[in-house]
Amino acid sequence: MTAPLTLALSKGRIFEETLPLLAAAGVQVAEDPETSRKLILPTTDPNLRVIIVRASDVPTYVEYGAADFGVAGKDVLVEHGGSGLYQPIDLNIARCRMSVAVPAGFDYANAVRQGARLRVATKYVETAREHFAAKGVHVDLIKLYGSMELAPLVGLADAIVDLVSSGGTLKANNLVEVEEIMAISSRLVVNQAALKLKRAALKPILDAFERASQNGG
């Protein structure tokens, strides 16, 4: 008996916005990860299961073959490097942007012009390093895993690099967006060996995902 395909997803927005794509492939997830304690979820297709992992771990599970394919944000893939992954489809879901934000009243442009060395808090250290290096901005990067908006408020950092959707959280914490680094959406990533060895099983799902993403879900 052939082992079922394994799809790696993270809880939250990516999971919710992937459900219509699965539905387009005729598949429904049998349990809700927000209420279930299970990390391996069955689907209505006996040949497909879903594993729930941290968003930042999706590329690793797919790269090493623990999952055949997965859905990951561009932010995660850029930081990971994307080695060993086939990225056939931009699913156009979980859209947002990665930006630099500073406290309201902080003259970021002037600080950059004067060559000031800035402390920047982010969980996207590699992406931030490349961005600031390309612009010739001197920074000390501080890696945090959450609550980025707090860092400038307590004097830990001059600026943050984080994901922004509506900007409401920034505004609530008296921060302003000063620079967009890149637009973010979620991509389908496929293990390269699985693409060769399990192509017959994968192709109908990948095709359905592509059609649904082009049609807006």
Curated annotation (Swiss-Prot):
It is an enzyme of class 2 (transferase). Pathway: Amino-acid biosynthesis; L-histidine biosynthesis; L-histidine from 5-phospho-alpha-D-ribose 1-diphosphate: step 1/9. SUPFAM superfamilies: Periplasmic binding protein-like II. Coiled coil: none annotated. Gene3D superfamilies: Periplasmic binding protein-like II. InterPro entries: ATP_PRibTrfase_cat, ATP_PRibTrfase_CS, ATP_PRibTrfase_HisG, ATP_PRibTrfase_HisG_short. Belongs to the ATP phosphoribosyltransferase family. Short subfamily. HAMAP family: HisG_Short. Catalyzes the condensation of ATP and 5-phosphoribose 1-diphosphate to form N'-(5'-phosphoribosyl)-ATP (PR-ATP). Has a crucial role in the pathway because the rate of histidine biosynthesis seems to be controlled primarily by regulation of HisG enzymatic activity. This is ATP phosphoribosyltransferase. The lineage of its organism: Bacteria, Pseudomonadati, Pseudomonadota, Betaproteobacteria, Burkholderiales.
